[in-house]
Amino acid sequence: MSLNKYQEKIVKAQEPYVVVNASAAAGKTQTLTERVRFLSQKGVPKDCIVVITFTNAAAEEMMERLGDDGYGIFIGTIHSYANYLLLSSGYDTSKILNEENFDDLFTKVQKHIDCIKPVEYLLLDEAQDTGELEWTFIFDMIKPKNYMLFSDHKQSIYRWKGAHPELIINLAKKEEVTTYPLFHNYRNGRNILNFAKRIIDKLGPDYKDNSLFASGKEGKVFELELDKNYIANMINNSIEKNHNYSDWFILCRTNSQVNEMYYFLKNQNIPCDTFKRADLSNKELIKRMNSNTVKVLTIHAAKGLENKYVVVIGQKFYNEEERCISYVAATRAKELLIWTKPAKKKKKIDVVNWE
């Protein structure tokens, strides 16, 4: 897929301090990858470019996309970059335990590295999920001379892990920072996108979804009381009409809900799979996604993924973070979104015509 004019402006941006406000399904990963390629092909030394991703799988995907253009560029999580700095300083990284959190790594970097060479070009993905400690590490320790931060605070779903989306929101408002929009939504049908907007726009102007409909599909949204048997029947009906099990996501808020739905579908002889994103490499993720099974996932595990038909189990909008999590869930669906709520009484409606 070629870049649109908004993506091209970001890829070739000349300003030193840039924040990209990227909505769901707007081509953020492609834009970030092509920005790295642009810098590399422009002649920026590879060791002067640092790309911080949120997960190892995202780093692996970017390296695969870049091919030879990415060779010699640091691409990895903030944990792995802290490890890299320690290793480069001569610190024995074998002393670092795999389970150490970033607080411990940050302390070790402070203690063992007297001076960190400022990064010439820093690119940061998922900036909305950055916490205060990571922010200090980036701006007070590695001190990038040029930075481009990609963010969508509407998808900030890690406050429980210390993320502060206000950091990137406030940075983008500074006079010296240039902001670029990335708003063309190429995934969601029009009705699905409008449903997602209604969820998130309640949070005020900083969270307003300015996404522009670009998928060319209308999409369908149905809000129903939760009935597991009805969901199973709906999946089976779609299979009878030559759709695939792999066309379906069942998205849950908690692991216990995942287990409940997974074993229920198994007992209904519906092939299904579940996994945690952190446990998979990018290649393993692609393999699992391509298998002809219904994917039963937490909403957090589904972030960054998409499917034709999505069922969301009993999600409520009772605070800011839950609205962001709900927004992520809704924007996974391309053609059909079934939004369920806890059942008060049995209610069966044939909502989908599979002809």
Q: What do the PLM-derived regions correspond to, one by one?
A:
Residues 1-12, 16-23, 177-184, 205-252, ...:
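Inter-lobe coupling/hinge region of RecA-like P-loop helicase motors
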Residues 1-91, 328-331:
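P-loop NTPase Walker
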Residues 2-12, 16-20, 74, 83, ...:
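Conserved helicase NTPase motor core
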Residues 26, 56, 190, 240-343, ...:
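Core RecA-like ATPase module of SF1/SF2 helicases and allied nucleic-acid translocases
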Residues 35, 65, 133-141, 234, ...:
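A short acidic, amphipathic alpha-helical/loop segment
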Residues 45-48, 143-146, 152-153, 174-179, ...:
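Short glycine-/polar-rich loops that comprise or flank the Walker A/P-loop
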Residues 155-159, 166-210:
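Conserved coupling/interface region of RecA-like P-loop/ASCE motor cores
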